Each structure stands twice: as structure tokens, then as C-alpha cells.
Amino acid sequence: LISAFSKAMGEKEEKSQQAKTLEYDFSGKHILLVEDNMINTEVAVMLLKSKGFSVDTAENGLRAIEIFNKSQNGNNDAILMDIRMPIMDGLTAASNIRHLSNGDAKTIPIIAMTANAFDDDIEKSKAAGMNAHLAKPIEPDKLYQTLYDFIFEQDK
């Protein structure tokens, strides 16, 4: 009986978790995805578009700065930034974005995505001006919740 109850509760919790995932709707929101690995980019774009995001991509930090700097104020709702990339890494790019004169450069949520999830790595990303740190492989629910928290809290 206890086993059946635990199983039923587990299924109920799983269904509740699935329902929570389906609640996210980012229609009309725009994100800049900065990732040098093509497979990671394709997977992330698929995950983001499935929840309504429109997505621009950049393969390195320098390209991300160029795209962000050319965008109109408020065009991007968030930036997802890999840390280790060629040409310019994510920490340097985030720091440079924070120093741009673009109107939302100081406030746009920049979220690190990296395999490096030690306390020291998290501190480095925050020191560079990033708002949050997601460990790879990215868990979709955690990604959506983090984006929701930053984007919709910012809209209030």
C-alpha cells in the first residue's frame, strides 16, 4: 500500500511538473543566444522557439557584442551566454556589454550557460555582470524558470 501510494504521489508530482513546463509562454519575447557549439545552438534554439521566443544567435562573444550594440533598445529580453568560446569568451563579452551605451546594456538579463558550475565559476560570471548561471547540460525546466523570473520580473 505504501509503495502504491508513493508511486501514485510520484506520478501526480510528475504530472504537476509537466503541467508547469507547459505554462511557459514567451510569445513576443526575443533572446540572443551566444554559443559556439553548433549542436548546443540547435538544441537551445529548438527549446526556446518551442516556448515562443524569437532567437538571434552568435557564435562568439565578439559577435554577440556587435549584434547587441546594433539592436534597438528593448529589442532583446535576455542574453544566454556560453562562457568558453573562441575569439571572445562569455565573461569578457558580458563585461563589455555592461559597458556599452546601448540603453538596456546595464539591465538586460545575461545568463551564463556553462559546464563549469563551481562556486568560483559562478562568482566570476557575476563579477562579469551576469545575472544567473546555468550548468550544462541545460535542464529545460530550469532554463524556462530562470528566463521567466528575469524577463517577467523585469516587466513589472
Where are each of the predicted segments found?
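C-terminal compact regulatory domains
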Residues: 1-156
